[in-house]
């Protein structure tokens, strides 16, 4: 038996074929474009996602018996606004998670409606990437399009709709819309009223592992699959990645070094960050989690290496950063290339190198980029620690986690052991696991994780190096407050 996992990312979809033992039989990826129609805007055509899935799944199954595929589960980029009309046609391009156009709407929600009310309604405050501010923006700036909305969806839910014909979402992904009462797992009437939408315009809610339907005849024919393949609700990318790393059940932590970076802390019970810096979301295992999200993580290293240094050989750039250089770098980097969410909630914040001298070598800047991302992740960890959340160790995933140097830097910046899973496929693997649960192969997500997820070698922190990084983090931590006003002034000049 096989299960297909779909990782609907920002730049590509990654498709994964998993057998009943948890082994990955095949992986295929298909890229699609991102449009930046105005500074700070970020959009995609949902048709490109579906075309990539339709092209990729037959390639994924090449050489395999498609009749043995039993289920499909998707993990997808969160927060994106997909709107359909009465004919289920896409009304406008999807406004993505990293789109920054909604600051005025965020200010209205947090300032006029008020953070206390938002937290009471949804367990969260407004952030520029969330879905509700995008609905307000659309109502104000595209009223004709807004009036045509029949269904509001998230990116991976659009794929599930194309697979099954069912308008659905799951609790983990819906948590990031600012429309869900996270504690009670239902749509918030207050938030729907604020945004001017009806509950009938929203998809049906499911737990991540629950089946939402089987393939339509059209989808089955296009993909070369049996029509009785079960499709589960799936999860937001971070929740799916946590499942794929084994971070299920209470008291676990998973850190992701993907395009964005996350600190994902699981809990069996509902809880809210009193500082409103961490998100309080539902988890794909039926529980809850606190999550800090930095908008630029591995993407910072990609930008630095490819756009500035004009190289894709990341390992070669990191080779000069020897052990004696760790904890001794006098160059600091703020990784706010797309603004920042946790903990600053500041779309105007920007990237910066601080501490350059005439004798600063190229490798010191590369090291500063890796350390700056690690320090930003520590910002999120420190907020959790301030609320007596004990983080003694963490699993680790994402493209950046493949770098031994970055793992070592992060382990020492955080002062905790970091362990990537043997299968480093994040949301796609988690999606396939959820599909296996939906098909009855395992009684629960936790049972599936215990059976399939196995640890790789652990990167341990070094006490002396932890002390050095503590001192440098204290310096780095003061840089954003010192530059905040300047960032706002730069934004005003645009």
What are these regions (language model features)?
Residues 26-30, 203, 457:
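Structural signal for short hydrophobic segments within the conserved structured cores
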Residues 22, 45, 72, 99, ...:
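Residue-level signal for inorganic ion chemistry
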Residues 92-106, 421-422:
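Short, acidic/small-residue loops that bind anionic groups at enzyme active sites
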Residues 58-97, 125-131, 160-181, 204-207, ...:
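Short beta-strand-loop/turn "lid" adjacent to the catalytic site in phosphate-handling enzymes
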Residues 1-92, 120, 148, 220-221, ...:
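N-terminal glycine/serine-rich phosphate-binding loop of ATP-dependent small-molecule kinases
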Residues 15, 81-84, 93, 265-266, ...:
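Short glycine-/acidic-enriched loop or helix-start segments at secondary-structure transitions
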Residues 4-5, 103, 110-127, 133-168, ...:
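Active-site core segments that coordinate phosphate-bearing ligands/cofactors
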